[in-house]
Regions:
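Structured catalytic-domain cores with a bias toward divalent-metal coordination
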Residues: 1-425, 510
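Extracellular and organelle-lumenal recognition/adhesion modules and their flexible linkers in secreted
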Residues: 424-597
Length: 597
């Protein structure tokens, strides 16, 4: 650190002398230079690998190399990753048995941060390992996020062991079985929500009471994973009500422990997440995942973070939502990353747990200092209301057992583009309700173009009134997601009025949670630090609390008041899940006015 005292020079000198040189970031390059990690890891049951950004190529490659060491030499049999548990099972099926393909399975986890060349290569290495070794390694997500796939997975399991209970869950849990309706769960009447939680509690009790019978009908592992689906569903449903992340890290730690229990005694796991989760940090009196895991497994964990001085990474831009490459210059003086950079080593690791307990290095390792910490979104204004910055305050030895340092980084390489739906200009009133046009009807907008997006096009089928129809359809290897056809309307002429949007629908959908819906969504003014690209709707109203399956033409309608704060609103046609839906005979009305379009 330029201009700092002799003690700081002593720190830099200690870093140079204690550094573990790393020969390469490239996987499949041998393990010789990683030998010092044997002592760092020791008899740990969990090795938790962090990353200073969610979009750095070198961090992913280094973590891949450490997984190779842990699996090949140290007996680890599980990789847990910061991704949704239910969706991750498709990746596990691929790495274990070659079911499906790696690219689809990875994209199906829905976390774009992992949908990169580096993680895809990791998955292919895991598949190679399992094809050539008797001791297998498994892939699990440990995040609770979206309720729908958890609900569907739970119903699938129950259909094998308790068909009557599965049928009851199809009905009772219906609002949570679709990606579109699950976020509206908090709007349901309290009695309806309580009925859902009561049903989940009954299911969890049945897992305990019927354990021996259900294990005999399936397997011990299936029983554990089925129960985890129920727990994750309960966690996700509660999040849809309070929208609070205060328990996020605790829940991730609980899910990790549940997965290790499912895999059996002696299971050892490598975890992948952001430094902010992997470390033993405390944020507003809430521990990070690493802190909770220490409590739960008795410090049988080693936390290895990553750090960098300068370079590129990928993240979604705050203002546009577009996933793109960003770069930063050298770390600011005094930052943990800057001190590591002063040692002048381009690629190294540092054992913090076994560093000196006195002297300049010990004092530095116990001190508070900033460390770069960049998540999935970059470019927050300095005064943003969330208080997001590009650094966290750390105490190095308290937070990490070791760190891997890369002087200059490059951005992770994505497997597919992530481009948000453009922010369309609001029209003064709905148009083309007749659905004219051969492809996507003029004046309407869709999110088509992504992997396994729903296909949207004009249909030859006539509506009940003999009019034109549009078909929204998809047959994908995953069960989540929905296809939308929307129009954005200025709220100026409609504030204070009640809107009604109606359509005739017909569906071909045979999966739980699949079907058709209509919706109205009211949006605030875009601009200022309060929103960036990620605008939180003021309100959303749907035609029903669950998607509608109707092989014959039927009519749906949704009504809602326009909030005074609304700047614009969307009218939308939705096909939830896999299958097909036809829409026609659209009507829009501002009730109480002369407007009827």
């Amino acid at each position: 650190m330029t201009g700092t005292g002799a003690a700081d020079e002593a720190v830099v000198e200690w870093i140079r002398s204690a550094a573990i040189p790393l020969a390469t970031v490239e996987p499949r390059s041998g393990l010789k230079d990683l030998e010092p990690f044997r002592a760092i890891i020791g008899d740990a049951r969990i090795v938790s690998l962090g990353e200073a950004t969610h979009g750095t190529r070198e961090f992913r490659k280094l973590k891949h190399r450490l997984l190779e060491l842990c699996v090949a030499e140290l007996g680890f049999t599980m990789l847990g990753i910061e991704a949704p548990f239910p969706e991750s099972l498709a990746v596990n099926a691929y790495v274990l048995d070659g079911i499906g393909n790696a690219a689809d399975a990875l994209a199906g986890t829905r976390y774009w941060v992992w949908d990169t060349e580096e993680v895809l290569d990791l998955i292919e290495w895991m598949r190679w390992w399992n094809e050539n070794n008797a001791r297998k390694v498994k892939f699990y997500g440990f995040v609770t996020d979206f309720p729908a796939v958890a609900a569907l997975g739970l119903i699938d399991f129950l259909s094998r062991v308790a068909p009557d209970l599965a049928a009851a869950c199809k009905t009772e849990l219906a609002p949570l079985t679709s990606d579109f309706t699950a976020p509206l769960f908090g709007q349901l009447a309290e009695s309806r929500r309580e009925a859902v939680f009561a049903r989940i509690a009954q299911v969890l009790a049945a897992f305990a009471q019927q354990r021996s019978e259900w294990v005999a009908a399936t397997s011990a592992l299936d029983w554990h994973l089925g129960r985890l689906h129920a727990n994750v569903l309960d966690q996700a449903a509660r999040f849809e009500i309070d929208r609070s992340y205060t328990s996020h890290d605790r829940v991730m730690a609980e899910n990790v422990c549940a997965l290790m229990e499912a895999e059996g005694p002696g299971t050892k796991a490598v975890l992948w997440s952001h430094n902010a989760h992997a470390s033993r940090a405390t944020y507003d009196d809430e521990k990070s995942m690493g802190g909770y895991l220490d409590e739960m497994i008795g410090r049988a964990q080693r936390v290895i973070g990553t750090s960098f001085d300068r370079g590129a990474f990928q993240a979604r831009a705050y203002t546009t939502g577009v996933l793109t490459d960003h770069s930063v210059p050298a770390a600011p003086p005094g930052a943990f990353d800057a001190v590591l950079a002063q040692a002048g080593l381009p690629l190294m690791a540092l054992d913090l747990a076994n560093a000196p307990r006195d002297g300049a290095a010990a004092t530095w390792l116990a001190s508070e200092m900033p460390m770069r910490s960049i998540g999935g979104i970059y470019g927050f204004p300095s005064d943003n209301k969330l208080g997001v910055t590009d650094t966290n305050t750390i105490k190095p030895r308290e937070y990490f057992d070791a760190v891997m340092f890369v002087a200059e980084t490059t951005a992770a390489r994505r497997n597919q583009p992530l481009v948000p739906t453009p922010n369309s200009v609001a029209s003064p009133a709905p148009s083309n309700l007749e659905l004219c046009g051969d492809g996507i009807p003029a004046g309407w907008q869709s999110g088509a173009g992504r992997r396994y997006a729903h296909a949207i096009a004009a249909s030859d089928a006539a509506s009940p009134n003999g009019g034109r129809t549009v078909r929204i359809s998809r047959d994908a290897p995953w069960r989540w997601g929905d296809g939308k056809l929307t129009q954005k309307i200025s709220a100026q002429a409609f504030r204070g009025k009640r809107l009604r949007f109606a359509a005739a629908i017909r569906t071909e959908a045979n999966d739980v949670g699949a079907g058709a819906l209509l919706y109205l969504q009211f949006l605030p003014h875009r601009g200022g630090d309060e929103s960036g690209f990620f605008v939180t709707p003021l309100a959303t109203a749907a035609s029903s609390t669950e998607p509608v399956w109707s092989p014959e033409w039927s009519r749906l309608a949704v009504e809602a008041e326009v909030p005074e704060a609304a700047d614009s609103f969307l009218i939308g046609l939705v096909m939830a899940g896999n299958g097909a839906a036809w829409f026609g005979d659209l009507e829009f009305a501002a009730i109480g006015s002369r407007a009827f379009l």
